[in-house]
Structures are given as C-alpha cells and as structure tokens.
C-alpha cells in the first residue's frame, strides 16, 4: 500500500521523500538522491548523512543482483519503488532503495555527515562511536561515511532490521533538505566484474564531495569525456 501522502512527520518541517519519488527510473532516482539526507533515529538522536554517491542497477543488466533471479532474500528489489533492500558486502551492511520497475534499484554508495538543528554534534559523536577507525579512534568526518559499508556502520543500519522494509518517518527516512548539487559526475560503477556490464555509466557523484566518496572520480589520471562526464544542474544524464 502506498504511504503517500506522508501524514506522520517527526517534526513539522521534515520533508520525507514519498514513495512516488522512488517509483521512477533508477537512473533518475540515483541522480536526484544526491543532496538528500538519510536520517536514522537511535534513541533520542537523529543520525544523518547527506547522500553524495549513488549507483543505479537494472534487472536486465548483468551487474545487478536482480539479474540473478528472484529469491526471498532479493524480494525487496522486485517490490514497488520505496522499499529498502539491504545485503552484506565484504562483511558489512549495504543500503539500497527499490526504484520503478521490478528488479531496479539504487545503491547508496557514500554519504557525508549532515549537521543541523535536528542532527547535531551529539548525533555526529554517536556516528563516530559506531564507526571508529582501525585504532578505535574517532574517524575523521570526511571518511566516516565514505563507502557503502562505512555509511551503514556510522548510521547504525543493519540488514536484519531494515531489509525489505518501507521507510518509517519516525525511525528511518530520506529527507529533502533543499540541497541540490551544482555539478554531478557520471561514471562507470565500481567493483563490477569484467563481462558483467562494467562499462555502464550508472554511477553518480556530487562533484563538491568527490574527494569523500568511495573512490574519487577526479583523481589524477582520470580524463573528462573518457573516464567520467561532468553534468551541470540542467544537463541530461547519459543513458
């Protein structure tokens, strides 16, 4: 059942994305998620991260989990847009949202801690305690959510709790805080095995935060037009 319109807000000016936002083409959803903020409630704290890197996946291409077929574990991919799909990657939790069309989804690849009156420095300290560095020290802010498993660890998001669930505005949702990237980088996805559509340009990065994503697409040796494309706010993305 659709939950539009959202009737139960956690605070008066919260703007949870409705299911209709997600129930669209995965590339469009992936790009437009940049700048949105994931909020997860832990006790009386709202942990928050701005989405800075996403990847789109489709049923009919070989890089997706859905291309391997329907299973109970993958059922969220085949539900309507706005369901949460979580799985384990390299031993850590990963967060995805189902998009329009069975089997299509968006992976939340990286985030950056978000601070405001709702999610303050106390919430940030909780995130750092959840995701310390290898020496047990607070991880620097720019690296705290710089990868799909680091993001989930810092946000306290776990597969058993959230896989195949819908958003809950009182516990976990994506907030539209009015931020829009001035430039977006489009490039090939990361970690796709050779021969499984690794060339498809289905990765999006907020250019302002390129240095804080999984792997900087603007690093030395990368060439515009060959390794990535830089899109302005009004520029159409590559299909």
Curated annotation (Swiss-Prot):
Q: Which UniProt keywords apply?
A: DNA damage, DNA repair, Hydrolase
Entry EC number(s): 3.2.2.-
Q: Which residues form a coiled coil?
A: none
Biological process (GO), any one: base-excision repair
UniProt GO molecular function:
alkylbase DNA N-glycosylase activity; DNA binding
Superkingdom field: Bacteria
Class in the EC hierarchy, top level: hydrolase
Which NCBIfam families does the record cross-reference, listed alphabetically?
PRK00802.1-5
Q: Which PANTHER family match?
A: DNA-3-METHYLADENINE GLYCOSYLASE
* Family, similarity comment: Belongs to the DNA glycosylase MPG family.
- The name on file for this protein is Putative 3-methyladenine DNA glycosylase
Q: Which organism is it from?
A: Pseudomonas aeruginosa (strain LESB58)
